[in-house]
């Protein structure tokens, strides 16, 4: 479990993330409260823009992101494949990453998505602790 993706340059509050949300794009407004939840997970949360998307990290290890597309918003999780998802919100087929798609006019299971965000934050904390116990990270980036 020590293969952790790492991003350098994460900071407490990244002005590039704020600029992304300030752009004139209605779908970004849908993404904002979910990223705010990620920001609020703990004092150790940092952020940066990664691949054009606001990304939340603990230290340099990402746990979540949001992104806006032409018809939907993704709320994504870097280790989402390992998260418990009793509401069945997560989509994707990759080895690790999963996302929840949000669309205009479709209901959102706020409680379940909030729990996924909290679970992703807790999960990255466990992963970071596991890395420390194993003598340091083997990074993927």
Model features per residue range: what roles?
Residues 1-141:
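Charge-dense, helix-prone N-terminal extensions
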